[in-house]
Amino acid sequence: MSYSVLEALRNSPDVVRKVLTARRMDASLVDKFLELDEKWRRLKKEVDELRHEYNKLSKEGAKAPPERRREIADKARELAARLERAEKELEETERAREEVLWSFPNLIHESVPICPEGVDSIPVRHWGVVKTTKDVVDKLDKGVDYLVVEKAPVGHADMAEVVLKMADTLKAGEVAGSRFYYLFDDLVWLDFALAMYALDYLAQKGFRPVIPPYMLKYDLIRRVLDFDTFKDAIYKIDGEDLYLIATAEHGIAAYLYKRELLEEELPQLYVGWSPCFRKEAGAGSRDIKGIFRVHIFHKVEQFVFSLPEDSWKWHEEITKNTEELIRGLGLPYRVVNICAHDLGAPAAKKYDIEVWYPSQGMYRELASCSNVTDWQSYRLGIRVTRKGMKREYVHTLNCTGLATTRTITAILENFQREDGAVEIPKVLRQYLEPIKAAPKDYILPKAAKSP
């Protein structure tokens, strides 16, 4: 049983150097690890030999005649002192070695593009007809189907707050700060309908619905994400050993912490719903208007625990699931393969699914689908026992089902009418029908009510 990054470091260090270079990281980290690993292996051998010698001497002392026992006891004390020093040095070296090992990102799949400066992803496929103004046509990806319109539609922020009057970020800013919001009336029902649509669809695909804990202890949160990079992006509960999750993925991954599984127990498929809490510390002034990029949003998430040999099949499958959900809504989208330098540390490969925003004349990220291979399971100690008692780390994968809050913004832009009404995608109507107060076909502008 071996962690793939550790195995590559020991057997193919040049491969890891290439990965770090492709990710635009310092490749000298490999040499730092190999030096510590060599020291650790030398000390491990020394400790094992000293223990063997000490045990042998102890047995010899028990059988020795009285006149030799003092001599053997003196040797045993000397050996015990040497063993204690060696064990302490081994422990310190192991801790330093593990710290460096944990700082390595995942290896990358051969299909991950290595991109030049200024390019973060490569389009893979497109679906749907994008509505665009003439000035944007030349900027579209090659082969995209488009329909030229006279003027760009109203942006999602103004649609929600000015036209429909069903969101209020100004008041939320007063009471909570920027990137918070109040959502009202039909947009609330739309959020719930989107969640039910995604949960229902994925449950029918065999995914087990779950609402995970919204907080995790430090020892778990550091195992499920690249904590050193993202510690400033997630919320910590003051005075508590707890962090708010940034996605349901975190809580679901932790569910099988330290579990030993049998082959027949895999795959395990989960579809989680949760609020997601993010500081958006690096966002600056980007997307400051509306509810596109906020501190709290709702999301349905796919998560898979897989046999190692099946994970790439599952990566394509969960990406396809999300495409089908977005296609069902009728939103034009593209799938892009994320370049090596833009991959998060856990991912061996990641697709983003980006939906067309006609007011901006561009595609924007709506979902991400990653194969994390054994990067997460190594840290969480989740293994599978194979036939012949061979043990391996399972592979984990995650993929957005629907980020419902952001999906609302895409619906507001793509399905608005001249009179300010917004057509509700047909697939959502069955989830709205049982609710008497909910809209059924259209979301109509409504006069704002005074607080």
Swiss-Prot record:
EC no. given is: 6.1.1.11
Q: Which GO terms describe its cellular component?
A: cytosol
The reaction(s) catalysed by this protein are: tRNA(Ser) + L-serine + ATP = L-seryl-tRNA(Ser) + AMP + diphosphate + H(+); tRNA(Sec) + L-serine + ATP = L-seryl-tRNA(Sec) + AMP + diphosphate + H(+)
Gene Ontology molecular functions: ATP binding; serine-tRNA ligase activity; tRNA binding
**UniProt keyword list:** Aminoacyl-tRNA synthetase, ATP-binding, Cytoplasm, Ligase, Nucleotide-binding, Protein biosynthesis
Q: Name one GO biological process term.
A: selenocysteine biosynthetic process
Q: Localized where?
A: Cytoplasm
| Biochemical pathway | Aminoacyl-tRNA biosynthesis; selenocysteinyl-tRNA(Sec) biosynthesis; L-seryl-tRNA(Sec) from L-serine and tRNA(Sec): step 1/1
User: Where is ATP bound in this sequence?
Assistant: R278, K279, E280, V294, E365, L366, A367, S368
* First-level EC class: ligase
The superkingdom listed in its UniProt entry is: Archaea
Q: What single Pfam family name could you report for this chain, choosing any that match?
A: Seryl_tRNA_N
Indicate whether Disulfide bond appears among the record's keywords: no
List positions binding L-serine: T247, A248, E249, E301, T400
Checking InterPro entries in the record gives:
aa-tRNA-synt_IIb, aa-tRNA-synth_II, aa-tRNA-synth_II/BPL/LPL, Ser-tRNA-ligase_type_1, Ser-tRNA-synth_1_N, SerRS_1_N_sf, SerRS_core, tRNA-bd_arm
Family assignment from sequence similarity: Belongs to the class-II aminoacyl-tRNA synthetase family. Type-1 seryl-tRNA synthetase subfamily.
Q: What is known of its domains?
A: Consists of two distinct domains, a catalytic core and a N-terminal extension that is involved in tRNA binding.
Query: Which proteins does it associate with, and in what oligomeric form?
Result: Homodimer. The tRNA molecule binds across the dimer.
Q: Please give the function described in this protein's UniProt entry.
A: Catalyzes the attachment of serine to tRNA(Ser). Is also able to aminoacylate tRNA(Sec) with serine, to form the misacylated tRNA L-seryl-tRNA(Sec), which will be further converted into selenocysteinyl-tRNA(Sec).
* UniProt name for this protein: Serine--tRNA ligase
